[in-house]
């Protein structure tokens, strides 16, 4: 399937995390009572889609670059399925439909700039509206997708699976949204983890690329993820060539970040594996854990300047990991 602009929808968030909509007079906030109506008008999952992806970008990403990044990741995944479709036997076909979450993440490439965007990402979710808005979006997508296997899976009746993909600070926005849903009273994830009953939505997998958060974030900050509406694993990549979550994160938070050293402590055991080449299959046993830390130090190596390889995540190996998660979700 060839990619087109129609395969991607864009959600723009204001600095306070509220949803904006494009009008003849420019961007303006969507009234709270119109959130679900706006989702229905702009973000209804098409019946042809097999998988719904929600992508949140990271630090130093312009709106145009965010869209380019999503197209790049989808193109890599498409090329991989065409090159080796037998690698993903349950992805027949693979027809993704993507929602890109954009937010103001630009700053000076300095310690002060890093702290500024770190604080903004945190404030947008904890003091602002980002977690609520993204959580409502995920709930809408879940309610309107077709359920591939019946009640406890986050796939619609026609079999649509929901995957979250974040990069850098965008991972924080997604984690806060899922955590927000875990605290809500009333929906739910082919993994061994039981489907969480009574949740506002369920996610089939969460891929966090070079997450900008402390190594103990899942134990101390995103503590509700252990009981959140996740049917599949939380998978986080890391590379010791990532200076943003290594050098800058260490100076900003006095400790290395997940994107540099992997997941540390978490509410459940953490499985650590290496990132595989597109020609090597990921066994179900390698990914079927609540938390999986993926060492990409041999893959994410390109980059110069203050961030190092922080944004070297758009690689065939990343697409292979995403496709493997989608395949094992069936």
Regions found by a protein language model. Name each.
Residues 130, 166, 170, 174:
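Gly/Ala-rich beta-loop-alpha elbow adjacent to hydrolase catalytic centers
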Residues 54-58, 167-168, 210:
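The conserved beta1-alpha1 loop
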Residues 39-107:
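Short, surface-exposed "cap/lid" segments of acyl-processing enzymes
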Residues 65-68, 176, 220:
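Generic recognition of short, well-ordered alpha-helical segments
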Residues 58-65, 122-126, 166:
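Extracytoplasmic/periplasmic, Sec-exported soluble proteins
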Residues 32-40:
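Glycine-rich, highly charged phosphate/nucleotide-binding loops
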Residues 1-33, 91-97, 101-142, 147, ...:
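Lipolytic serine-hydrolase domain surface
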């Amino acid at each position: 399937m060839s990619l087109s602009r129609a395969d991607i929808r864009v959600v723009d968030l204001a600095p306070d995390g509220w949803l904006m909509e494009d009008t003849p007079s420019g961007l303006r906030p969507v009234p709270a009572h119109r959130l679900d109506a706006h989702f229905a008008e702009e973000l209804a999952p098409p019946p042809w889609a097999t998988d719904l992806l929600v992508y949140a970008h990271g630090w130093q990403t312009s709106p145009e670059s965010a869209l380019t990044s999503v197209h790049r990741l989808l193109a890599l995944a498409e090329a991989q399925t065409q090159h080796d479709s037998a690698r993903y036997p349950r992805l027949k076909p693979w027809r993704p439909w993507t929602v890109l979450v954009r937010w103001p993440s630009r700053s000076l490439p300095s310690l002060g700039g890093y702290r500024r965007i770190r604080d903004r990402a945190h404030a947008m979710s904890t003091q602002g509206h980002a977690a609520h808005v993204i959580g409502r979006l995920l709930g809408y997508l879940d309610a309107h997708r077709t359920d591939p296997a019946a009640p406890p899976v986050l796939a619609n009746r026609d079999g649509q699976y929901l995957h979250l993909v974040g990069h850098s600070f965008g991972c924080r926005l997604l984690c806060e949204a899922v955590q927000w849903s875990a605290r809500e009273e009333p929906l739910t994830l082919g993994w061994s983890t039981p489907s969480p009953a009574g949740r506002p939505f369920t996610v089939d997998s969460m891929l966090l690329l070079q997450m900008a958060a402390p190594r103990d974030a899942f134990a101390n900050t995103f503590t509700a993820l252990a009981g959140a509406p996740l049917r599949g694993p939380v998978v986080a990549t890391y590379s010791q060539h990532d200076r943003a979550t290594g050098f800058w994160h260490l100076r900003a938070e006095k400790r290395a970040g997940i994107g540099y050293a992997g997941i540390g402590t978490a509410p459940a055991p953490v499985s650590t594996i290496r990132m595989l080449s597109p020609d090597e299959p990921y066994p179900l046993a390698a990914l079927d854990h609540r938390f999986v830390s993926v060492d990409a130090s041999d893959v994410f190596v390109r980059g110069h300047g203050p961030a190092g390889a922080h944004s070297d995540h758009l690689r065939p190996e990343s697409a292979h990991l995403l496709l493997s998660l989608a395949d094992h979700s069936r």
